[in-house]
Swiss-Prot record:
Record field: catalytic activity: NH4(+) + 3 NADP(+) + 2 H2O = nitrite + 3 NADPH + 5 H(+); NH4(+) + 3 NAD(+) + 2 H2O = nitrite + 3 NADH + 5 H(+)
Keywords assigned by UniProt, alphabetized: 2Fe-2S, 4Fe-4S, FAD, Flavoprotein, Heme, Iron, Iron-sulfur, Metal-binding, NADP, Nitrate assimilation, Oxidoreductase
Cofactor: siroheme; [2Fe-2S] cluster; [4Fe-4S] cluster; FAD
Gene: nasD
Species of origin: Bacillus subtilis (strain 168)
Name by which UniProt lists this protein: Nitrite reductase [NAD(P)H]
Amino-acid positions noted as binding NADP(+) in the UniProt annotation, renumbered to this chain: 193-223
Lineage: Bacteria, Bacillati, Bacillota, Bacilli, Bacillales
Length: 805
């Protein structure tokens, strides 16, 4: 009997969490297919505000990367929307005319932002704040415009406003209520929050109702019902969300505010479940992650036939993610005749605490300025703890006063530390004592604590410190390369050298990896470190590379690939152009585009056509997919330009031919400009060369991406040979001392320009670095030609393996 077909509609946090729970209890029961409307793998939507605020990058909020889907034999269709469920024939139909049968179906369509139905809401410059696309829109706007208006002073609106402030914009927050976050805070806490955020630079317009968004093609401002107005170049709508029930309603699945489900997350149609923000349970649709994960656990067990307690609803807690502000609320914090409040207000230090009691039970809490007791109070609310024999005011006094410096020391083992993932203090202690976890990353890998919003990370570290005592290593909390080991990057590298290790599995076995198979974070890193240390003897582990590097092409959101052949220095000829044109016609490649690195990108190549395309092109790989040298961009130079002082094309071609295929911690881009006019943009490259009278200037650590950084002047040299010598030593030193996935810009800021200069100015060290560089380059093979010669591997990779699409 074959596996049952399980289809998940929605690639977000709730739906994929349900899949994770299913895999944990019945890994081989289902053949899983996932449809996601966005072009990305599953990511942590909660942390988009951190991306906007500049605290993290998009890549860092990915929860399950492309490799996770492949490793679990999951067929992922990104950028594809299910538009109909045929409940009679048990199939789903997508906007790409794909028909997918199912035995079990999970609807996790999430929610959609509420856009005010006012004139001008469709103008350019008006956006919601729900996904990566919205975040990119705001990041792009901040580079061109200066005045932002955020409509909505709730949790999401304030996090968006803080991010826009960090991006250098003037931010006004428009809110209909008389104080901020009125659904989570009382008036006192709301006004304290307003005062704090005003100090950070925000402007607030309270009790304002937006009547119109004004402007021609693009937004220019807001007009309010009271006749006043403000200027704005960007408007962010953060006034709420509503469950996305369109698919359910149009498919005959009963809906109300959300898709109606029972206590096991089943809809009224057999074999169809709903989970997350789209689901309505006992009249409530939840929008926070903790209840959605609780739902996912119940759904998974029920679908797999495992006895489980029903889902009976959730008590909610909220924590604002804005730097420098501590805000927490939980439960029912509004006072009434039946509910009385106890409040503590330290006006001098800006600390406000309030609990709401119904009889002898805490039913709600609000904390401002000091949220350290939030988890403890939330646990008491959830458990409906009887406090009849407790001094009421003592509940608001920090337990740390009675139990040393550790808040968590006084907590019971069943108290929840990570509300998002339902991880208790006892579960964390068990992971430390029984599984040997000794860092927050390892705790995250073992238990899931701090995996979502990250707010509980200080408490997790505190439990580690209290449990391990003198064995606790604070430095290890930040330096372990992943949760599979306690070893730092430097320790791993030293162990590989000392023990002569040559394969990723050997490293994990010998160095005592806690997860035998490793993870998608450590395996590519180990593979890189092994090749960097001993390039002539190590065994490349293709399975430890990211999917683009395994396929030697970039996967696109529709499952096709892009192919970029090498064009040294951005220079081509008629023969190569004819080859490219013939390949485009022969394989019906839908898009041909010039890249920013002066190359030609063939986009939309079918997976099975990749080897044939490479063979017909008969050109070297451009490594557009790898952690390696990408391009060397050049201007036309002194041969043709009236201002050029040097032959930039010749040097660019020499650099690219020397260093092509060089594995590096992250991608490396170079450029050579023939004069200080810098037409090749040498000043924002990892290594940039600028021609001057009588020689060259070398710039390093530049970045033209999200975190724009001008390169630093490394030195001046006179000849092309010196450029190649110093470039080789610089790149080798970067290879040997950078963390895997650390760009040269971040590495240079970490180690310091003066330190790098002192290393490269030492002739002996420079010679040694170039010697190791030349050894590495001596084993380089063009991967496309290598695959064409290795028929067996090519067949396995391009014909038999299930990949994400």
């Amino acid at each position: 009997m074959g596996k049952k077909q399980l289809v998940l509609v929605g690639n977000g946090m709730a739906g994929v969490r349900a899949i994770e729970e299913i895999l944990s209890v019945a890994k081989d029961e289902f053949q899983i297919t996932i449809f996601g409307a966005e072009p990305h793998p599953n990511y942590n939507r909660i942390l988009l505000s951190k991306v906007l605020q500049g605290d993290t990058d998009i890549k860092d909020i990915t929860l399950n990367d492309w490799d996770w889907y492949e490793e679990n034999n999951i067929q992922l269709y990104t950028n594809e929307t299910v538009i109909k469920v045929d409940t009679e024939n048990k199939t789903v139909i997508t906007d790409a005319d794909r028909i997918q049968p199912y035995d079990e179906l999970i609807l996790a369509t999430g929610s959609v932002p509420f856009i005010l139905p006012i004139p001008g809401a469709d103008k350019k410059g008006v956006t919601a704040f729900r996904d990566i696309k919205d975040t990119d829109t705001m990041l792009a706007a901040s580079k061109q415009y200066k005045k932002a208006a955020v409509i909505g002073g709730g949790l999401l609106g304030l996090e968006a406003a803080r991010g826009l402030l960090n991006l250098g914009m003037d931010v006004s927050v428009i809110h209909l209520a008389p104080f901020l976050m009125e659904r989570q805070l009382d008036a006192t806490a709301g006004r304290l929050l307003q005062n704090e955020l005003e100090k950070q630079g925000m402007t607030f317009l309270l009790e304002k109702q937006t009547e119109e968004i004004v402007g021609d093609d693009r937004v220019e401002g807001l007009r309010f019902k009271d006749g006043t107005s403000i200027e704005a170049d960007l408007v962010v709508m953060a006034v709420g969300i509503r469950p996305n029930t369109t698919l359910g309603a149009e498919s005959g699945i009963p809906v109300n505010r959300g898709i109606i489900v029972n206590d096991y997350m089943q809809t009224e149609i057999p074999h169809i479940y709903a989970v997350g923000e789209c689901a309505e349970h006992r009249g409530i649709a939840y929008g926070l992650v903790a209840p959605l994960y609780e739902q996912a656990k119940v759904l998974a067990k029920h679908m797999c036939g495992i006895e489980t307690k029903p889902y009976e609803g959730s008590v909610l807690s909220t924590q604002l993610k804005v730097s420098g502000v501590e805000v927490f609320s939980a439960g029912d914090f509004n006072e009434s005749e039946e509910k009385k409040a106890i409040k503590v207000f330290d006006e001098q230090d800006g600390i406000y605490k309030k609990i709401v009691l119904r009889g002898n039970q805490i039913v709600g809490a609000v904390l401002f300025g000091d949220s350290s007791e939030g988890n403890r109070l939330f646990s008491m609310i959830q458990k409906e703890a009887d406090i009849s024999e407790t001094s009421k005011i003592s509940i608001l006094q920090p337990l740390s006063q009675e139990a040393g410096t550790s808040i968590t020391a006084a907590m019971s083992d069943d108290e929840i530390i990570c509300g998002c993932n339902g991880v208790s203090k006892g579960a964390i202690i068990q992971a430390i004592q029984e599984k040997g976890c000794s860092s927050t990353d390892e705790i995250k890998a073992c238990t899931g604590a701090s995996r979502s919003c990250g707010g509980c990370k200080p408490l997790v570290e505190e439990i580690l410190q209290h449990t391990l005592g003198s064995d606790f290593d604070a430095s290890a909390q930040k330096e372990a390369i992943c949760g599979c080991t306690t070893l730092s990057r430097d320790e791993v590298v030293e162990e590989i050298k000392a023990k002569g290790l040559s394969h990723t599995r050997e490293v994990m076995n010998v160095l005592g990896w806690k997860t035998p198979e490793g993870c998608s974070k450590c395996r590519p890193a180990l593979n890189y470190y092994l090749g960097m240390i001993n390039p002539t003897k190590y065994e490349d582990d293709r399975t430890s590379r990211f999917v683009n590097e395994r396929m030697h092409a970039n996967i696109q959101k529709d499952g096709t690939y892009s192919v970029v052949p090498r064009m040294y220095g951005g220079v081509t000829n008629s023969t190569d152009l004819r080859k490219i044109a013939d390949v485009v016609d022969k394989y019906e490649i839908p898009l041909v585009k010039m890249t920013g690195g002066q190359r030609i990108d063939l986009i939309g190549v079918k997976k099975e056509d990749l080897p044939k395309v490479w063979e017909d092109l008969d050109m070297p790989s451009g490594y557009a997919y790898g952690k390696t040298l990408r391009t060397v961009k050049t201007c036309v130079g002194e041969q043709f330009c009236r201002f050029g002082t040097q032959d930039s094309m010749a040097l660019g071609i020499a650099l690219e031919k020397k260093f092509e295929g060089l594995n590096t911690p992250h991608k490396v881009k170079m450029a050579v400009s023939a004069c200080p006019r810098n037409c090749a943009e040498s000043g924002i490259k990892d290594l940039g060369v600028v021609g001057i009278d009588g020689g060259w200037e070398l710039y390093v650590g530049g970045n033209g991406g999200t975190h724009l950084r001008a390169g630093d002047l490394l030195m001046k040299v006179k000849t092309n040979e010196e450029v190649l010598e110093y470039a080789g030593a610089y790149l080798q030193y970067y290879r040997e001392t950078a963390n895997y996935l650390e760009r040269t810009s971040a590495w240079l800021e970490r180690v310091g320009l003066s330190h790098v200069q002192s290393v490269l100015n030492d002739p002996e060290k420079r010679q040694e670095l170039n010697g190791r560089m030349n050894e590495t380059l001596s084993v380089h093979k063009d991967p496309w030609k290598d695959f064409l010669e290795d028929k067996q591997t090519s067949k396995e990779l391009f014909e038999n393996v299930v990949t994400t699409s």
